[in-house]
Design a protein with these regions (language model features):
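Hydrophobic anchor at the start of a short beta-strand
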Residues: 59-60, 113, 202
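A secondary-structure boundary/capping signal
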Residues: 41, 116-118, 138, 172, ...
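Amide-donor transfer/coupling interface in amidating biosynthetic enzymes
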Residues: 144-229
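Flexible, glycine-rich phosphate/dinucleotide-binding loops
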Residues: 45, 68, 122, 129, ...
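Solvent-exposed alpha-helices and their adjacent loops that cap or buttress functional pockets
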Residues: 30-32, 72-74, 105-106, 114, ...
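Redox-cofactor binding/interface segments in oxidoreductases and associated redox assembly factors
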Residues: 82, 115, 205
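N-terminal beta1-alpha1 cap of cysteine-dependent amidohydrolase-like domains
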Residues: 1-12, 17-96, 102-106, 215-219, ...
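Cysteine-nucleophile active-site neighborhood
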Residues: 86-158
């Protein structure tokens, strides 16, 4: 099957997604339609789904254990999104719904994952200001609500390695306060704090790219992590 190549500018026109004027050139290279499961127990899953659908991915929602199991059995799970929201609620629901162990196993086995804000907290090995930890697949430590609660939310422009200058939306956001493995790649720093990292198959962000009109973070996830382009 011939690869489909879309320039970011074309994608913006086709999906009403905005490209920053100073953005690095990026392409979506789809050798086939990739299938991405989006955790949908709580949080901003619909926004992630709209962004990925606009980039040509085949998305589905993971609301309960059987959704995850069926996707694995059918070979339909090529990537996972853990959205922003409330990490304590999401973590409790994952345990109550019996999905924690399987998600952890899938991620540790190499299934690509994009985690934003609360999703980042679900992944990390340690939360420096909270005793609770969840999947523990990402060797970093984070500080929850590091910028304060709702009144501490803000928007800023900063550089993301491999992506370019990007407008970041921080909403009751954590930041990464310690890297625990030399293989963790820091992708973005804001005011001296690490806010985006990659570790093998895991892309984790403090901010919310799904509420942006800029699709480049999701494009990077599809290109470089899901498809390994």
């Amino acid at each position: 099957m011939k690869n489909k190549i879309f320039h970011t500018q074309d994608l913006c026109l086709r999906t009403n997604l905005r490209c920053a004027k100073n953005s690095a050139r990026m392409e979506i290279i789809m050798s086939e339609k990739v299938s991405i499961g989006i955790l949908a127990v709580q949080g901003a899953f619909a926004e992630h789904q709209a962004m990925l659908d606009g980039l040509g991915a085949d998305t589905f929602l993971i609301r309960q254990k059987k959704d995850l199991e069926e996707a694995v059995q059918n070979g339909r799970l090529q990537g996972i999104v853990l959205p922003g929201g409330e990490s304590t609620v999401q973590g409790k629901l994952l345990r109550d719904l019996g999905m924690s162990d399987q998600l952890k196993e899938l991620i540790e086995a190499g299934t690509p994952v994009l985690a934003t804000c609360a999703g980042l907290i679900l992944l990390v090995e340690r939360v420096s200001n909270d005793d609770r930890a969840y999947l523990k697949t990402l060797p970093v430590s984070v500080k929850r609500n590091a910028y304060g609660r709702q009144l501490g939310s803000f928007v800023t422009d900063a550089e993301i390695t491999h992506v370019g200058t990007y407008r970041m939306n921080f909403i009751r956001a954590p930041y990464i306060d310690e890297i625990l493995d030399l293989q963790v790649e820091t992708l973005a720093i804001v005011d001296g704090n690490t806010v985006a990292v990659r570790y093998k198959n895991q892309l984790a962000l403090s901010f919310h790219p799904e509420v942006s009109e800029d699709a480049r973070v999701h494009a990077y996830f599809l290109n470089e992590i899901v498809q390994g382009v």
